[in-house]
Structures are given as C-alpha cells and as structure tokens.
Amino acid sequence: MRKIALFPGSFDPMTNGHLNLIERSAKLFDEVIIGVFINTSKQTLFTPEEKKYLIEEATKEMPNVRVIMQETQLTVESAKSLGANFLIRGIRNVKDYEYEKDIAKMNQHLAPEIETVFLLAEEPYAHVSSSLLKEVLRFGGDVSDYLPPNIYHALKQKKNDWS
C-alpha cells in the first residue's frame, strides 16, 4: 500500500516551518498532498489561488509533493476523497499538542483507517506562526529568515499594497 499523507492548513503565508515539515514528510511518505483549505469565513492575506501557486513554487524540487485547494470540510473527509491514509500535523509546543491531540482522537473515531502523524517543529521554527510573521512585518520588522524567498517577496508586495 502506498503511503499518502495530507498536510492540511490555511498557509497564510506558508513559513519555513511549514516547508521544513513538508521536506521531512516527503522523505517519510510516497506522496504528500498539501491541502490549502479555503475558509470563506476567514479573512486571509493571500487568495487560495495565490497560496497554491506560492507553495507550488516553494516545493517544486520535491517530486512527490503536490498542492491542491480544498473546500473547508472535515479533514478526514478530504483525506478519504484524496486517498490519503495519513494526516500530517506540526507541533510547536505543548499548547499545540493538547489542541492537536483532541482533534486526532476525534479524527481516529471518524476515520480509524487514517493515522495522524505529529512532527515536532525544529529550531529555529518552533516559535514561528504565520500570524506572528504578518504582525511583525506589519510593523516593519524583518521576517525574511522565516519565509521561503518567493513567499517573502510576495508578502512584501502585499505590505506595499497596504501602504
């Protein structure tokens, strides 16, 4: 059986922490599907199409990684429809673990054939979130160390558009 993993998220924007998880997942699984979830109730910086394109560019050297846009639904339902038998979740700290553990237990109840795999965030990304980076950038801080170059440039352009 092929090992297919879904890594779902809003990725607004995708960070080097996300990219690190994707690189590590690509070594563990036959295929990694990055699911850019479309949440119409959430205000995002990038459109789903922009996020998909930016992530594809950042992961283009990984042949077993593909990026899709996915309407918001139960993650396990997305995994089933894509043929994924694993879900990837990144854990930065104890708070993330407690939150993700409960979701993983519910997902296991809903779809016992799908296994959740937790990957611990590596330094220097363990403290980084997309929200934090957007906030730092908004006030003029340098976030270039935490973003893939193409995403950093796109984010800077968005910031210029805000001004």
Curated annotation (Swiss-Prot):
Name the source's superkingdom: Bacteria
| One GO-annotated biological process of the protein | coenzyme A biosynthetic process
Q: Which keywords, in A-to-Z order, does the entry hold?
A: ATP-binding, Coenzyme A biosynthesis, Cytoplasm, Magnesium, Nucleotide-binding, Nucleotidyltransferase, Transferase
**Which EC numbers characterise this protein's activity in its record?**
2.7.7.3
Principal place of residence: cytoplasm
GO molecular function terms listed in the Swiss-Prot or TrEMBL record: ATP binding; pantetheine-phosphate adenylyltransferase activity
| One Pfam family it belongs to | CTP_transf_like
A GO term from the CC aspect: cytoplasm
Binding of substrate, residues: S10, K42, T75, R89
Site-annotated residues for Transition state stabilizer = H18
State its cofactor: Mg(2+)
Pathway it works in: Cofactor biosynthesis; coenzyme A biosynthesis; CoA from (R)-pantothenate: step 4/5
- InterPro entries named among the record's database cross-references: Cyt_trans-like, PPAT, Rossmann-like_a/b/a_fold
- Sequence positions that bind ATP: S10, H18, G90, I91, R92, E100, Y125, A126, H127, V128, S129, S130, S131
Annotated compartments = Cytoplasm
Q: Which reaction does it catalyse?
A: (R)-4'-phosphopantetheine + ATP + H(+) = 3'-dephospho-CoA + diphosphate
Per the entry, what this protein does is:
Reversibly transfers an adenylyl group from ATP to 4'-phosphopantetheine, yielding dephospho-CoA (dPCoA) and pyrophosphate.
- Return the similarity comment: Belongs to the bacterial CoaD family.
Q: Tell me the subunit arrangement.
A: Homohexamer.
Question: What is the protein named?
Answer: Phosphopantetheine adenylyltransferase
